[in-house]
Amino acid sequence: MDKRFAIVVSRFNAFITERLLLSAIDGLVRSGGKKNDIDLVRVPGAFEIPLAARKMAETKKYDAIICLGCLLRGDTAHYDVIVNEVTRGIGQSAQETGVPHAFGVLTCENLEQAIDRAGLKMGNKGFEAALVAVEMASLTAGIRRPASGPRNAASKKQVPRFARNDKDENRTDKDKNRNDKPKKKAGNTKRK
């Protein structure tokens, strides 16, 4: 695989995020990536992930960005605010830069859930985020790649204005004739 990836990982809840990080790197390598093609950025907390991911994406050096963090619900509304902003920020960055962002930010009710999702019972969300990044990088590269063959004005075929399809069968002769007549150019009309 000839792709470059950036991983943005939060230092907050490092016990969990380090497990996510190691698993994400493992997922990229198992998918054919090279460790030299992976850049890592550490941020203080999950709230800082979207900005760092955006800056990495704007360089256009990466085929995908993997965002890793862990948010645990507390006793205040702070958790809900941060979850919403992180989710919105990561999605907005992906949409506005055109670079896929894999969401590997755990949003858990308690530490036990986070531990489970970091590889002890339910797989590892870091690994899953890496697989998403690989798939989306390949998908978007295929969409951006031009179709095979030359792409210049001389090679373009003229496409008829009305392609034949089932709807053409339902048009009346009057409609067909009206659409097939050449249009008059402005300024060529004479009054009598």
What are these regions (language model features)?
Residues 41-59, 105-106, 110-111:
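Glycine-rich oxoanion-binding loops at beta->alpha junctions
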Residues 109-123:
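Phosphate-binding/catalytic loops
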Residues 48-90:
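Glycine-rich phosphate-binding loop
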Residues 123-146:
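A charged, well-structured terminal subsegment
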Residues 80-107, 116:
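Short, acidic/small-residue loops that bind anionic groups at enzyme active sites
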Residues 141-192:
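Intrinsic disorder/low-complexity segments
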Residues 11-12, 70-71, 106-110:
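Short, ordered loop/turn segments at secondary-structure junctions
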